[in-house]
Amino acid sequence: MASLQRKGLQARILTSEEEEKLKRDQTLVSDFKQQKLEQEAQKNWDLFYKRNSTNFFKDRHWTTREFEELRSCREFEDQKLTMLEAGRGVGNCLFPLLEEDPNIFAYACDFSPRAVEYVKQNPLYDTERCKVFQCDLTKDDLLDHVPPESVDVVMLIFVLSAVHPDKMHLVLQNIYKVLKPGKSVLFRDYGLYDHAMLRFKAGSKLGENFYVRQDGTRSYFFTDEFLAQLFMDTGYEEVVNEYVFRETVNKKEGLCVPRVFLQSKFLKPPKNPSPVVPGPGS
């Protein structure tokens, strides 16, 4: 099993079979069921973690390779980095970062109370180096847990796709309040025409590029245009916004699985310096 990766600014081109499948799957889940899924979103994610414990997602050691902001504090011993991992699940990004770098302090939150408890039970959990709390980023104020404009970097890794598109801007507004001016949100999530999107059966579609899994959890598949507009409408500036294409090849079984992610960086604009008021006689 091997993985090949490349990056690009254009969306993946579908095969004719894939295009035909998506054209056929136009029937949307009923409004009643959609409302029920929204009301039960937290319960469905909590049940997901109950079923899978800490075993579903692999630890993510690629974050420092892809995002230089997570490496910068290693250059000087006394340089500290305060980060927020929003929707961090059971700590698959959090703990590798804390283990690799003693100069990081992390705030971390998740929608699921069960996921938060799993993090607190991890042997690497240290209250001196991280603060973990339960939070619905669409309605719970991060300022109840994190001081305003105190965070150097926010990680939004495979989180926003689980939020209803109508509420995504609320997440971005929430994290904007705790991010320092001139600092970044690091984003990675499912991209348009990812293999997971093409595998959904008929009757799973909630809206444009938005689907429900059999367990009731939902997933949105991003275009670069949609994401850029979402961030910029909330006051951020685009720095990087590109597709990541990965092909997982199993030569023995003759399989090639096309994965598509969107990897991006958006900046909270720096504060303008106060204008210098000329003194008398100047």
UniProtKB/Swiss-Prot annotation:
Stored Pfam families: Methyltransf_12
Gene Ontology cellular component annotations, sorted alphabetically: cytoplasm; nucleus
GO terms, biological process: methylation; tRNA processing
Disulfide bond sites: none
Catalytic activity as recorded in UniProt: cytidine(32) in tRNA(Ser) + S-adenosyl-L-methionine = N(3)-methylcytidine(32) in tRNA(Ser) + S-adenosyl-L-homocysteine + H(+)
InterPro entries: Methyltransf_12 (IPR013217), METTL2/6/8-like (IPR026113), SAM-dependent_MTases_sf (IPR029063)
Name under which the protein is recorded: tRNA N(3)-cytidine methyltransferase METTL6
Organism: Pongo abelii (Sumatran orangutan)
Gene behind the chain: METTL6
